[in-house]
């Protein structure tokens, strides 16, 4: 759906669908959990939901009453080992300032995908879901994403860090380039679901099961060490 603030009604853009089903969703329409716009190329937006694929659409090609081709993504991302999986779905997406796409999976990990060379020219067809076209890059692990819908985000003036909540109530911060965990903070007594960075200053807002929103800000330039119980907190995917 598209909402124009100048209009009193919403506009249907496309139907996100799949030809196969899984435990979470029967064949047909894909239930969506996350929609993000690429700020660098604002007519591209990515969606993720009840299957394993993050799909990228060009809003200029989206017309509800047009041909079926208008419902086809211009690109599709999925880790190779999850292609065809019936047990995972996407809970959160985020675009970096350089068009990298961050994808968080339920009962799995977080993956960073680069904008590949075929992004603009990939045919609008089922071939978009060919594993040969899917390029996995960095992987971020240690958090637990099972109980609720977890968001994911970037942090830093140049998106140097990756953020995620966890079922253990902690906020995880990894250095993007090395995929190395650098901060682990208690953000909720139960679960941390969402994290949002201020666009201009190093402030971070988080929320979870508790009835409040927490605002975080750095107190100094020194990076504190990880807590002594870090090994007890980290979740290892089996």
Language model features: what each stretch is:
Residues 17-22, 61-102, 106-111, 115-161, ...:
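Terminal intrinsically disordered, low-complexity extensions flanking WD-repeat/beta-propeller proteins
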Residues 1-70:
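Solenoidal tandem-repeat scaffolds enriched in leucines and small polar residues
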């Amino acid at each position: 759906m598209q909402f124009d603030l100048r209009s009193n009604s919403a506009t249907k853009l496309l139907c996100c669908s799949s030809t196969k089903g899984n435990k979470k969703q029967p064949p047909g329409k894909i239930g969506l959990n996350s929609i993000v716009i690429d700020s660098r190329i604002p007519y591209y937006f990515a969606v993720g939901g009840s299957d394993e694929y993050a799909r990228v659409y060009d809003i200029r090609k989206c017309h509800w009453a047009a041909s079926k081709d208008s419902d086809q993504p211009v690109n599709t991302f999925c880790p190779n080992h999850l292609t065809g999986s019936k047990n995972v779905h996407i809970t959160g997406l985020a675009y970096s300032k350089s068009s990298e796409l961050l994808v968080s999976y339920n009962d799995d990990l977080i993956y960073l995908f680069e904008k590949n060379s075929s992004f603009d020219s990939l045919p609008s067809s089922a071939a978009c879901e060919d594993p040969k076209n899917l390029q996995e890059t960095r992987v971020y692990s240690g958090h637990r994403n099972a109980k609720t819908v977890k968001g994911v985000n970037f942090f830093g003036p140049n998106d140097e860090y990756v953020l995620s909540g966890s079922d253990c109530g902690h906020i995880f911060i990894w250095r993007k380039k090395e995929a190395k965990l650098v901060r682990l903070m208690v953000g909720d007594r139960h679960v941390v679901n969402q994290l949002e960075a201020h666009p201009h200053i190093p402030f971070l807002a988080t929320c979870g099961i508790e009835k409040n929103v927490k605002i975080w800000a750095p107190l100094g330039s020194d990076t504190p060490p990880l807590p002594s119980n870090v090994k007890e907190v980290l979740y290892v995917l089996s």
